[in-house]
Amino acid sequence: MTSTALNTAGYQQQLDEKAERIQNIFEDFETPELEVFASPAEHYRMRAEFRMWHEGEDLYYVMFNQETREKYRVDQFPAASRLINDLMPLLVEALKPSQTLRHKLFQVDFLSTLSGEILVSLLYHRQLDEEWEVEIKKLKQCLNDEGFNLNIIGRARKMKIVADRDYVIEKLNVFDQTLTYKQVENSFTQPNGEVAQKMLEWAVDCTQDSDGDLLELYCGNGNFSLALAKNFERVLATELAKPSVESAQYNIAVNNIDNVQIVRMSAEDFTDAMAGKREFRRLKAQNVDLQSYNCNTIFVDPPRSGMDEGTCRMVQGYERIMYISCNPDTLKENLEILSQTHKITRFALFDQFPYTHHMEAGVLLERK
């Protein structure tokens, strides 16, 4: 059995094992009953990437065994969305006859959406020319005539050619609200669309009786900011990655949300700004007056490394802390500080990555 095969019959068992494992990790903390949010058992990943293998006239997708590093052919990938699986064979068959499009092609990346859009990135070990552009536009039109809503990117060293967009538009349903998100190629997006919707609904439910303003660190493309905006008077959100900030600004505008402001700076710099250690010109340039905000709640979704101690101490200054974590081990380390002043009142497991050891957790903490 290759790693492309899924044991869908064993899905619930692996989820139960994760739930037990995460409860064991946090057994030293007083936690409420664990809320468990399942994933679809297959076709849950909204993105996938494959190496391309050239064998005579043949061309096909391959993956590599993580332990032996041996390659194996992949014609279908049940973990990926149905949209990706539908496109995979048609794309490779369209590439095969064209020497221009297949020459030194070494990788294909897919980014799909629940809304029906899909973006394909073709990576090459050669520079791309006008002939490639002509051919790729023909291929794109051919596949869109088959019913796809497809855009394509060609990449080579220090080179990027876009036909016609380098992003997809996703639509996520959060209770009775439909939110629109711009998701840019090579920027972080939640990999599991169905579970992402459940995470947003959980966050909205946790904060439905809020007052005052919300501060959010590590906001990405505004994924949570937009969903939570209706529960607060204002939202002030920080993000360091420039493409994510640009997407967040687009998402705020397209959803007609007028109470969210995004500031491009790191969580560590923002901590210094909040403490008054130094002034930041970018805050002044964006007319952000930190003293005007009345933030009782803070939302954090840090990278796998978690928050540093200084950020944890800053976060402790808020009445309520909502923490989404992709690494329970660093969440545990942070909770050893946060639990000195706050108690855990909600505790959730989101199965973003079925059949792997990875676990996504959510906790709501309230001041003791």
Curated annotation (Swiss-Prot):
Keywords: Methyltransferase, S-adenosyl-L-methionine, Transferase, tRNA processing. It is an enzyme of class 2 (transferase). The active site is at C326, E360. S-adenosyl-L-methionine binds at Q190, Y218, N223, E239, D301. Its EC number is 2.1.1.-, 2.1.1.35. One of its GO terms (biological process) is tRNA methylation. It comes from the Bacteria. GO terms for cellular component: cytosol. GO terms for molecular function: rRNA binding; tRNA (uracil(54)-C5)-methyltransferase activity, S-adenosyl methionine-dependent; tRNA binding. The keyword tRNA processing applies. Belongs to the class I-like SAM-binding methyltransferase superfamily. RNA M5U methyltransferase family. TrmA subfamily. PANTHER family: TRNA/TMRNA (URACIL-C(5))-METHYLTRANSFERASE, TRNA_TMRNA (URACIL-C(5))-METHYLTRANSFERASE. HAMAP family: RNA_methyltr_TrmA. Dual-specificity methyltransferase that catalyzes the formation of 5-methyluridine at position 54 (m5U54) in all tRNAs, and that of position 341 (m5U341) in tmRNA (transfer-mRNA). This is tRNA/tmRNA (uracil-C(5))-methyltransferase. The gene is trmA.
